[in-house]
């Protein structure tokens, strides 16, 4: 932005203190050059390296800068010391005697009228992009948010129309509406207390501060515009509608319902929601629903027709594998003995029926039917012959 360096602070200084130094540098006369900002950055590096601690307003006064080494940095420090030590220069700051020591100076510099304001210029697109980049991750109304906008205002001296353009570029529609409500209330309260240089007969504060010779009146409007950011009402965090995407297993009806709820919470009344819903209901749908809408030619159709097309869509779920036991060949078990066949007649040993001769009870108890064929002894069987045992 102009001759200003990046708002990101160098090593050795907090973002708030760095923005305060940049605001003080903007009040140099003649106006600051790129070399002034380079000297300011080199001074911070030197202070952090030599003092072994971060730069602060209390530790880095005008006496901390060696004369002649860093250009006009001593003048920047003197301006900062004068503004932060002046009770009237810091709106909302209490007098030192009303606070217990030590007295902490205000962390945000006010906009100071610099006499004839002939520095006004319209925003360039690159300036708006730089401002948005610096505060895109900051909460609206936070200290760094306000200080960054304050420094941008110092460099361009914007009119109410320029500030409205800036608001539309950096803030969401909901924050724009809340800020406008807060600004309108602040202007009404200040008008009742008679703004310096404000004449109700010549129009509203917005109209009068837009005039080329508005002077202090424009500065007061700019202060009110910044103050309105601090008074934004708190609201519950709602998921931005642009980040709502249909999940792979989420039904299309539930996805569209979440999208409609987010738009209702984020967009102010009067802003048409149908074009956004019609666009995002296809762009943020999952691939399967997009294929259905493409096949039916409903990419740019209203959301109602898309709901009818995808109402019965269901995600394809993978069925778990089921292990089925298939009977195989039977393994052979223990061999069962064959049923005994009854003998055809009486046992030839005992002449009784019902058993075979091999199972005859008299086989082991009775005398052998004849002499042993080996030793001719009639008292034992052949298997019990002593001659066989002696040979073994």
From Swiss-Prot:
Site entry: Cleavage: 109-110, 323-324
GO CC terms in record: viral nucleocapsid
Sequence ranges of the Sequence repeats: 342-362, 367-387
PROSITE patterns the UniProt entry points to: ZF_CCHC (PS50158)
ZnF segments: CCHC-type: 345-362, 370-387
Motif placement: PPXY motif: 100-103
Gene3D superfamilies documented for this protein: 1.10.1200.30, Human Immunodeficiency Virus Type 1 Capsid Protein, Zinc finger, CCHC-type
Keywords, ordered alphabetically: Capsid protein, Host-virus interaction, Lipoprotein, Metal-binding, Myristate, Phosphoprotein, Repeat, Viral budding, Viral budding via the host ESCRT complexes, Viral matrix protein, Viral nucleoprotein, Viral release from host cell, Virion, Zinc, Zinc-finger
InterPro entries, per the entry: D_retro_matrix, Gag_p24_C, Primate_lentivir_Gag_pol-like, Retrov_capsid_C, Retrov_capsid_N, Retrovr_matrix, Znf_CCHC, Znf_CCHC_sf
Covalently lipidated residues, kind N-myristoyl glycine: 2
Gene Ontology BP terms: viral budding via host ESCRT complex; viral translational frameshifting
Molecular function as annotated in GO: nucleic acid binding; structural constituent of virion; zinc ion binding
Pfam family, one: zf-CCHC
Protein name from the UniProt record: Gag polyprotein
């Amino acid at each position: 932005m102009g001759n200003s360096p990046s708002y990101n602070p160098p090593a050795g200084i907090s973002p708030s203190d760095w923005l305060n130094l940049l605001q003080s540098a903007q009040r140099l006369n003649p106006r600051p050059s790129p070399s002034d900002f380079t000297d300011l950055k080199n001074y911070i590096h030197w202070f952090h390296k030599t003092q072994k601690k971060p730069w602060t307003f209390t530790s880095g006064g005008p006496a901390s800068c060696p004369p002649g080494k860093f250009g006009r940095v001593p003048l920047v420090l003197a301006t900062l010391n004068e503004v932060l030590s002046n009770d009237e220069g810091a709106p909302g700051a209490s007098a030192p005697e009303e606070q217990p020591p030590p007295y902490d100076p205000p962390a945000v510099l006010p906009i100071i009228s610099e006499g004839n304001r002939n520095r006004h210029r319209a925003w360039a697109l690159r300036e708006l992009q730089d401002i948005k980049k610096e505060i895109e991750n900051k909460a609206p109304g936070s200290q760094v948010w306000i200080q960054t906008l304050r420094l941008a205002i110092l460099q361009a001296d914007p009119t109410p129309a320029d500030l409205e353009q800036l608001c539309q570029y950096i803030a969401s529609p909901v924050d724009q509406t809340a800020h406008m409500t807060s600004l309108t209330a602040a202007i009404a309260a200040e008008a009742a207390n008679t703004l310096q240089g404000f004449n109700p007969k010549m129009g509203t504060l917005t109209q009068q501060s837009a005039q080329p010779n508005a002077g202090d009146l424009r500065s007061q409007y700019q202060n009110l515009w910044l103050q309105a950011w601090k008074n934004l009402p708190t609201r519950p965090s709602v998921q931005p509608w642009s980040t709502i995407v249909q999940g792979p297993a989420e039904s299309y009806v539930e996805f569209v319902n979440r999208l409609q709820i987010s738009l209702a919470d984020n967009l102010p009344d009067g802003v048409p929601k149908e074009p956004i819903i019609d666009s995002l209901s296809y762009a943020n749908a999952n691939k399967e629903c997009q294929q259905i809408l493409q096949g039916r030619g409903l990419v740019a159709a209203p959301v109602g027709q898309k709901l009818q097309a995808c109402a019965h869509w269901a995600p394809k779920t993978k069925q778990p594998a089921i292990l089925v036991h298939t009977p195989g060949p039977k393994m052979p078990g223990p061999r069962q003995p064959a049923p005994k066949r009854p003998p055809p007649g009486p046992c030839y040993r005992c002449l009784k029926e019902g058993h075979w001769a091999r199972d005859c009870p008299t086989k082991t108890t009775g005398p052998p039917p004849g002499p042993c064929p080996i030793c001719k002894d009639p008292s034992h069987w052949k298997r019990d012959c002593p001659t066989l045992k002696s040979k073994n």
